[in-house]
Amino acid sequence: MASSRISLRLVRRFASAAADGTTTAPSSGKISVSKAKSTLRKEHDPDKALKIYANVSDHSASPVSSRYAQELTVRRLAKCRRFSDIETLIESHKNDPKIKEEPFYSTLIRSYGQASMFNHAMRTFEQMDQYGTPRSAVSFNALLNACLHSKNFDKVPQLFDEIPQRYNKIIPDKISYGILIKSYCDSGTPEKAIEIMRQMQGKGMEVTTIAFTTILSSLYKKGELEVADNLWNEMVKKGCELDNAAYNVRIMSAQKESPERVKELIEEMSSMGLKPDTISYNYLMTAYCERGMLDEAKKVYEGLEGNNCAPNAATFRTLIFHLCYSRLYEQGYAIFKKSVYMHKIPDFNTLKHLVVGLVENKKRDDAKGLIRTVKKKFPPSFLNAWKKLEEELGLYSKTDAFPSSAKEAAAA
């Protein structure tokens, strides 16, 4: 409760600054928006995230970075179901003089979508006349994105048809069509997405590589390999700019075939002048893991740096899971420590297997150390499952009690 009061004070002070026509920090600890963006990527505590965002010295210095920082802050709050704080934060921006600028206004619609608060996003879109903000495909796309992020996949086509009829200045562009295509793919109907793509082609509109790749991914996931391969060939014929995302979708499918096929595609990427990334190598590592070839998988992991890549959360999650599956818990714990150093700690379900395995193998100190580390890295609202696991395994003690506030967690 105390942390929530602190958050509301920060938000209200930020709102006052916006009303005064400034976006300066409410406290003396000013930071640049770029620094805030970088720090927020590593910060999971919603109160700390809110404080970082509120202390940005000038949100107008980099609008793109500012939008990203705002969306990260909203996601941290949403993870803890702090919807009231999210509403207060986003509504505070409606006092900003830039509210009449459509790109600025659209960030508010998008942010509500990041929190799956679609009704708020819709209301904000409908309020644009009230604030004297013009509408175009920019705000329309923000609304479609908010709907998509809120997982209202069936509503996206409805909005796509209805909104341009209500507001004649809104003309869907290739981004609008791309969002519509993604909504069909996310709902498991790539065949409808292909129909939309054909409509675009009939109108002479560019079908972006992103749209092609989205359909390709959905087809591979449904096991429609022949249709997917035909679409890939069409992309090549039409001269689409094949990028990492497009190749990684093919690699995702190839991992089910064999590690050798994945390696072939990685080599093909390189021959096309593309640089395989962490996602590419994660699929290769997964292909080895799923076939019990852990030594080969570890070589891929250890070779990431040499390939100018850094492990991400999926890298650590995959490797730790399969090491635990093979009962190699000490190796899993070593990988966990690296994930902490990289600020890429895997999810609870992955680490639960590791903790249980460490305890079963009489590595209780390591198990307690892992849980102690997690306590320091995440806010108390994230830790209920960990507390329950501690008690079940007999690891819980009063001296290791979970912090009752974010402040205590930071001091732990």
UniProtKB/Swiss-Prot annotation:
Ranges for the region named Disordered are: 21-43
Q: Which family does it belong to?
A: Belongs to the PPR family. P subfamily.
* Subunit comment: Component of the mitochondrial ribosome small subunit.
Instruction: Spell out the InterPro entries in the cross-references.
Output: Pentatricopeptide_rpt (IPR002885), TPR-like_helical_dom_sf (IPR011990)
Cellular component per GO, a single term:
mitochondrion
Q: Which UniProt keywords apply?
A: Mitochondrion, Repeat, Ribonucleoprotein, Ribosomal protein, Transit peptide
Q: Where in the cell is it found?
A: Mitochondrion
Protein name (Swiss-Prot/TrEMBL): Small ribosomal subunit protein mL103 (rPPR7)
Q: Where is the transit peptide?
A: 1-14
What ranges does the record list as Polar residues composition bias?
21-37
MF terms per GO, please?
mRNA binding
| Pfam families associated with the record | PPR, PPR_2
Q: Where are the PPR repeats?
A: 101-135, 136-166, 173-207, 208-242, 243-276, 277-311, 312-346, 347-377
